[in-house]
Amino acid sequence: MKNIIILIINTGSSSLKFTLYEYQYQSEQILASGIIEKIKTTQAIIKIKFKNKLLELTNLNIKSHKKALKHLIKTLTNKKTKIINYLDQIQGIGHRIVHGGAQFKNSVIINQNVLNELKKISHLAPLHNPIAIKVIEQMFILFPNAKQVACFDTSWHQTMNQKAFLYATPYSWYKDYHIRKYGFHGLSYAYITKRTAIILNKNIEDLNLIILHLGNGASINAVQKGRSYDTSMGLTPLEGLVMGTRSGDIDPTIIPLMSKILKKTTKQIENILNKESGMLGISCKSNDLRDIWIESNNNEYNSKLAVEIMTYRIKKYIGSYLAALDFNIDAIIFTAGIGTSDYEIRKLSLQGFEKIGIKIDFQKNNLAIDKNTEYDISSNQSNIKILVIPTNEELTILEDTYDLIKNN
């Protein structure tokens, strides 16, 4: 197949990220990339990089994602940018979809049946899926000749066994209402697994890994024989690790209890657990770990406590996944913003594991701070590899989109 132009779209509740690629198998060139922010306001911003230039438009009246798409098209095709000459040059559009439920085990070409299924599970990701669906529908109007592909953050985890994904709630909740662990960050984990296989020169099917995706949102994935075996996020991204603003694991009775005490609805309490908890909640200052480290290094109590709680939770999950994988793993990998740049978090997360042969090289670890560079930070005496690998979720979407277009 000749080089084709593919547009990658990542729809947020008030933003639209995009990258335009010229792509041929395992060879990609970025033609343009950018973001439209503050959608649904009169202060919207468009930032776009192309041909070593940066274009920024501010104070735009963009009241909907539909209008944002029209601005995007205008920006890609106008005489000033000349990124593409006409819309039909774009042959494929890959969408990142937060939640695919249990229906979508792989990326798929979008048709009306796929859209109907997505609408049925919109309640599982009410902040993201409905807007993504609207964007897809608008894209069918704007790009009638392009094939659209849905790539799901949940698909990677569809290989989990029932013992890993079921909650110990009435079984009818699962059968009738699809209440179960789905997991997220799947596009990241798929990329990291594939990349680790290349680095270690092993077949993917032979890989057992523990991958830590540590950013403002954070999760851990146990990988057995190259497939997702267990993960920390659940029905929603709220379960699991302590995150920037999310609480992670809590006793569920806290919700009705605090609802009664604070005289707030359960929806309001859920919002607090999602947006006012985690590192922000404990530190009482910030969800940004860089800010928290400044305070922690000045011996500020809550900031130190936030780091301790965060890394303690990570250690517990690493230990439990080591046991779940029968202590048979090839590597532990750190990825995403915090995972690739914060050597202290990596050190604290693995503290104590040297007693079972998982040994970090402190000097290598301290030097591993470039978010765009891969590192091996394991000691020569370590029984397994400890790696730092920047993730590339867009590349997973790009490759899946290309493969599906090529074969259909």
Curated annotation (Swiss-Prot):
Enzyme Commission code(s) on record: 2.7.2.1
Gene Ontology terms, MF aspect: acetate kinase activity; ATP binding; magnesium ion binding
InterPro entries with a match to the protein in the record: Ac/propionate_kinase (IPR004372), Aliphatic_acid_kin_short-chain (IPR000890), Aliphatic_acid_kinase_CS (IPR023865), ATPase_NBD (IPR043129)
Active site (record annotation): D153 (proton donor/acceptor)
Co-factor requirement: Mg(2+); Mn(2+)
Alphabetical list of Pfam families matching this protein: Acetate_kinase
Family listed: Belongs to the acetokinase family.
Complex and partners: Homodimer.
PANTHER family: ACETATE KINASE, ACETATE KINASE-RELATED
NCBIfam families on file: ackA
Listed name of the protein: Acetate kinase
Gene: ackA
